[in-house]
Structure formats: C-alpha cells, structure tokens
A protein has these predicted regions:
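Conserved phosphate/pyrophosphate-binding and hydrolysis machinery centered on Walker-type P-loop NTPases
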Residues: 20-27, 95, 109, 124
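Long, contiguous binding/interaction regions
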Residues: 36, 48, 52, 64, ...
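NTP-dependent small-molecule kinase module
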Residues: 35, 107-143
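ATP-dependent small-molecule kinase phosphotransfer cores
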Residues: 1-42
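Short gly/ser/thr-rich secondary-structure transition/capping motifs
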Residues: 24-28, 43-47, 99-104
C-alpha cells in the first residue's frame, strides 16, 4: 500500500469497497510510515499529500502552484509534443487522479488554499517570478 501511495495510485477499487470501514486506520498508517520515512533530512516533497502529512511541523512550508487551463495546455503541448485536444485531455485526466488521490488519503479538497500556507498562480507570474516569490516567502517565514 505504501508503494501505491508513492505512485499516487488508489488501491484496487474492489479491495477499497470491501475494506471501507478500515480506511481511516489504513490511511493513518500509510501517512505515518511516509512521515517517518522522510523526516530525517531536509527535502522537497512534490505532491503525495505533503501538506497534510506535515501540517503540524513548524519547519515545513506548504504551497500549491496552480495555473489557468490555457497556460497548462500550452506548456503541455510544448513539453509533451502533442496537440491541444490531447494536451487538455491529459491535464484533465492527471488532475482528476491527483484530486482523487488527495481526497482518498486526506479527505481534503486538493488545491484548496485553506490547506496550504501559500498558493501561487504561475500563469500570472511566470515560472521565474513564481520561483522568486516562493523563495521570498520561505526566506521570510524562516527568519
């Protein structure tokens, strides 16, 4: 199950249906194992419910970077060498999987600004300025 967590894949739906009553206990176990596994050193965690797992850790900065759909499509078309329709389909598919994964393990809404210390719209600032704003936020927070 920890392997499924790292790959952001929900458990088999049949197993999930059978074991629904034990969901909270299992989720707590997976999240605890994950927390113990990577708390030894400084690190950057992208996804995998990091905002939830580390929400009580003072040294942690949680952030969510989002973008408008047109910017996502343009970036995906360029990086994945695909047309607009396929890029949009891929984005919608990946985002729906991320949303379901986050909901499954945290019962929170993925991307909800209330669950992060900082949210940034990278389509407004661009990649470079987004990175600069994140660095400035972290520097200010940890002074």
């Amino acid at each position: 199950e920890l392997e499924n967590f790292f790959s952001e894949k929900p458990m088999d739906s049949l197993l999930y249906s059978i074991a629904i009553n034990n969901m909270e206990k299992r989720n707590a176990t997976v999240l605890k194992q994950f927390h113990e596994l990577i708390t030894e050193n400084s690190f950057v965690l992208i996804g995998r419910c990091g905002n939830y797992i580390y929400k009580n850790d003072e040294d942690v900065t949680t952030l969510f970077i989002h973008s408008d759909m047109d910017s996502k499509i343009e970036r995906t078309m360029h990086k994945q060498n695909m047309d607009r329709i396929k890029a949009k389909e891929l984005i919608e598919y990946v985002d729906s999987k991320r949303e379901a994964f986050h909901k499954r393990y945290t019962d929170e809404t993925w991307g909800d600004a209330r669950n992060y210390q900082l949210t940034v719209n990278s389509s407004v600032l661009g990649v470079e300025q987004t990175a600069e704003q994140i660095i400035a936020f972290i520097d200010k927070k940890h002074r």
